[in-house]
Amino acid sequence: MFNQLSDEQKMLKKLALLSGIKPCTASSMLFSFPYSQQKLIDASTQKLFDLFGKLRNTDRLKFLIEEAIDRGIDIDVQDKDGFTLLHKSINERDYNIAGFLLERKANPNIHDRDIVTPLNRIAGKPLSKTEEDFHMAKLLLQKGALTEPTDFSGWTPIQYAVFNEKIGIVELLIDYGANLDIIVPKGFYKGKNLIELVRAISSIFSDQSLNKQLQTLLKLATACQNNDFGLVDYSVKKENSDTEDDSVTKEDIEKFINHKISIKPSVKLLPKYLKELIRLKGFLETKEEFIKDNTIKRLEDNINSKSSLKYLLLSKIVESPSLYKFDVGMPEDLKESLEEHGLKLVGDID
């Protein structure tokens, strides 16, 4: 039985499935990955790469990297495996060094010879589900990591995050606008979208409640993205009911809304964010229980606030923020949002 396998065996079986190899066959032990073009580096730089995983003194490693940069080394140079210094730090889970490199403008979108980016790598590690992984993925996205790079299997980060039960990273990628209509291009799960993928691997999950949480998150997020609320098999949960099913409850929707309201989308993602909230509000207005409480009002308030923010961020204020001043009646949350986007209005123009 699959559930009786060790974590390492589960990981190997998952990798075999991703590569299109049927489990329990001789070929499942011999799958390999294609390589991309290699880039060679000089011997002194190779020594720096070799220190990863060996030198445990983080400050010393930072010093050596700084010294190499001062000598003129390209921070994005690649070794024979296509790894950059950022790749090496991610592979070794040395996230302190990874953050250090990103602050020095390391490119988060370079792929190695297996066409794997740092974000692909974090999402694709089957046995690594820590807070550190989540925060590293978040930092990569904040520093410009793309959400849609495909690796040797044609998988994107969100597909790997779903497959590996990393619900925090799935939610993070949704916040950053990841494509939720992505289809598995080949292999055992060929043709499946994200929701179908979660259902297909439900027997692999040791925690079935986590599988349901993933399904619920993807149903709601995809419904908002595509304005297709037929995906949301909503039901009012009856008190004292112990029945477990795949339906989306009022509590699920409220949790989803709370998260959506809490995030601070970039200027680029604001239009998409607003469109999705307006669609969700329209869906909830057909449900009496949401009309009775303040859920819809909370959505309306957030939509109005973010719409005002969008208007200001796309106006002439952005060109010369120092010339303008805050309107006396401007809500505090809007003032804070402007300042979070780097706009301090201290001038004389209303």
Curated annotation (Swiss-Prot):
The keyword Amino-acid biosynthesis does not apply. The keyword Repeat applies. Keywords: ANK repeat, Repeat. Pfam families: Ank. SUPFAM superfamilies: Ankyrin repeat. ANK repeats lie at residues 81-110, 114-151, 153-182. PROSITE patterns: ANK_REP_REGION, ANK_REPEAT. This is Putative ankyrin repeat protein RBE_0589. It comes from Rickettsia bellii (strain RML369-C).
